[in-house]
Amino acid sequence: MKKTLFLALPAIALLAACSKGNEQPQQAQAGPTFHDVMKDQIDKHADEVWDVTNPAVGDKGGLDPSKMTDEMWKQLAEDATAVEEGAQQISQMDKIVVIRPGETIADAGVPGGHSAAEVQAEIDRNPQGLRDHAANLAATMRDLVAAANAKDAAKAGPIIDSLDGVCEGCHLDYWYPDQKALVEKIIRENK
């Protein structure tokens, strides 16, 4: 009996060692996740782009340069730069990880919203498409930075007007793709 137990102990230890590796929690993302960059950099500063420019919309639409102060132009350039940098970071991510284990995303549990796992599955289906959306956003913001630095309302206005569409295109592909057909129908009906 002692001899059998003595021989069985190494096999049990080996089996336990192999099993233990499978029970370890998933290693945390080493750097910012997709959600980190979206929440803390892109969304935050895109909202600030609109906050700075909405009061300067002219009576006939577009950006009215007489309503833009030097400080507003400076703030616009800074916020557009922050969005550009965040978008550039996402466009260069090797492995795009939505969140770290145990975290949640905005709109999870909200009707029409998706869980992090659902968003991750959409990204995993076409990660290059997400990188391309991010690169497009970065290029759009680069143009806005140049227009803001030049205090050129004629160039900045249309870029700001297009920003919602640039963002929404990516959101419809990755964040809430089941609403894409509805949005496209509404757009067609309102043309």
Regions found by a protein language model. Give the residues of each.
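Charged/polar interaction segments and conserved charged motifs
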Residues: 1, 83-86
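Bacterial N-terminal signal peptides that target proteins for export
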Residues: 1-8
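C-terminal active-site/capping subdomain that shapes the small-molecule cofactor and substrate pocket
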Residues: 11
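Sequence context surrounding c-type heme c attachment/ligation sites in exported
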Residues: 19-68, 73-77, 81, 88-191
